[in-house]
């Protein structure tokens, strides 16, 4: 059974954006508390909990969910922790937003675990591949010197290749694909009504050729060019809007609980507002039908 693309009101778009921003921001803060492990030349750490934005971009409007997640990472994971790299942050912002947006577009049937799995892997893969290309480019163009890793060949391709594989296993599979395959079927049809949004039924009528148009490809390539240039400039110390205040150090490691509390309060507030909004819409429809 086909369906038309879901139409969102401005309030619904804002709620999806804030929900994604606060939830992924909160998740990023918790990853800061998790330990890192080193096995030989390989560093094992959780860069981000990919299943959260992946779940949101598949259940809701991909653009607002992806954009909200990227903003949440910057606000709660960088700015409030005093670790904002200025212009250099633009690279990660563009790459992650683009990757999650494409992942959301790839899913046309939320009842298909195969589609969910492919979209989840492709989303994280795009993010990691774009980041790898930029890192390799910085060394090849002589902008940054190669930092040799003991136990690995002194080759940027080998170093970045190992990093790419570990990120795909940890962020892509363990904390991306597996949780998403479990959560999406559980949440599908239950969380959307909270925002007054009709759950997606069947397949979207628009084909991938309509989504991935020439215009979309041109914009994506242009954004990647901007991301690469911004990272190159930041590496060459041509940077601005950096926010790394020294006074935050006096609060010690316990300071992280302040942004965690802020993100949690925003998330709970959005959920409460969404429930009230849904109830008011239901009440209005009931009165009209009566």
Residues of each region from the PLM?
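Hydrophobic alpha-helical transmembrane segments
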Residues: 14, 18-22, 63, 67-71, ...
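Membrane-helix interface "capping/anchor" motifs
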Residues: 56-69, 108-115
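Membrane-embedded alpha-helical hairpins and interfacial helices in multi-pass inner-membrane proteins
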Residues: 33-45, 109-262
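Alpha-helical transmembrane segments and their immediate juxtamembrane interface regions
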Residues: 23, 247-282
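Short, charged juxtamembrane terminal tails flanking transmembrane helices
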Residues: 1-7, 201, 280-290
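Hydrophobic transmembrane alpha-helices
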Residues: 2-60, 64-65
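Interfacial aromatic-anchored transmembrane helix boundaries in multi-pass membrane proteins
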Residues: 30-43, 72-104
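Membrane-interface capping segments at transmembrane-helix boundaries
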Residues: 186-194, 273-286
């Amino acid at each position: 059974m086909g369906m038309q693309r879901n139409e969102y009101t401005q309030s619904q778009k804002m709620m999806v954006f804030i929900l994604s921003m606060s939830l992924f921001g909160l998740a990023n803060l918790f990853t800061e508390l998790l330990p890192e492990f080193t096995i030989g030349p390989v560093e094992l750490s959780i860069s981000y909990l990919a299943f959260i934005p992946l779940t949101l971009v598949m259940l809701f409007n991909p653009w607002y969910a992806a954009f909200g997640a990227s903003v949440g990472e910057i606000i709660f994971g960088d700015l409030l922790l005093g670790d904002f790299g200025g212009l250099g942050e633009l690279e990660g912002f563009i790459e992650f937003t683009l990757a999650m947006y494409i992942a959301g577009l790839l899913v046309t049937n939320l009842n298909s675990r195969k589609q969910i799995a492919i979209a989840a892997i492709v989303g994280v893969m795009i993010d990691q591949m774009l980041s790898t290309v930029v890192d390799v480019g910085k060394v090849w163009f002589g902008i940054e010197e190669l930092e040799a890793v003991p136990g690995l060949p002194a080759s940027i391709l080998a170093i970045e290749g190992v990093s790419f594989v570990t990120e795909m296993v940890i962020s892509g599979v363990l904390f991306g694909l597996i949780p998403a395959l479990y959560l999406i079927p559980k949440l599908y049809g239950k969380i959307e009504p909270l925002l007054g949004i009709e759950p997606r039924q069947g397949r979207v009528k628009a084909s991938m050729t309509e989504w991935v148009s020439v215009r979309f490809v041109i914009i994506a390539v242009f954004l990647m060019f901007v991301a690469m240039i911004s990272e190159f400039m930041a590496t060459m110390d041509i940077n601005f809007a950096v926010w790394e205040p020294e006074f935050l150090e006096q609060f010690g490691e316990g300071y992280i609980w302040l942004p965690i509390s802020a993100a949690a309060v925003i998330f709970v507030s959005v959920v409460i507002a969404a429930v009230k909004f849904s109830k008011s819409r239901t009440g209005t429809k009931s009165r009209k039908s009566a």
